Amino acid sequence: MADLLTITKVPGRVTIFHLAGKLDGQTNESLLEAVRKEQAAGMRFLLLELQALEMITSAGLGALHNMFKMLSPKAEMEAWEKEHHGEPYKSAYFKLAGAPPNIYYVLNIAGFLSNIPIYPDTPTALASFGD
């Protein structure tokens, strides 16, 4: 996991997980444990920076799905669904940045980009969280 994850905290608001290497069955649980640990310490907003991620497997996609569920308030999602009739809920709490083309392709074809906002780079993604 040490090779996969580096954590940066933006003062007062967003935690950035910088991923590198492979997100697969060997690393997914460690990533989820890091999310749990940061959430317990008060993390509310998470940006996953993917620039150095080389590969994501189905286990890695499962980890992203679990992270989305962990960081998206259920009541907010339910209210969105009632109000927006079939439009997908986009997380305000969990976002992605800097995905290489091969990772972007997998995320898109698997349907993740319907619910998780993605940005071309970290500064743009950070700005999307607002103040």
Residue spans for each PLM region:
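Short acidic-hydrophobic, aromatic-tinged amphipathic segments that line or gate anion-handling sites
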Residues: 117-121
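Short beta-strand/loop segment at the start of cytosolic alpha/beta domains
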Residues: 1-18, 23
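Residues at or immediately preceding the N-termini of alpha-helices
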Residues: 28, 122-123
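A short, charged, amphipathic alpha-helix used as a generic interaction element across diverse proteins
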Residues: 125-131
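Amphipathic alpha-helical interaction surfaces in cytosolic regulatory modules
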Residues: 25-115
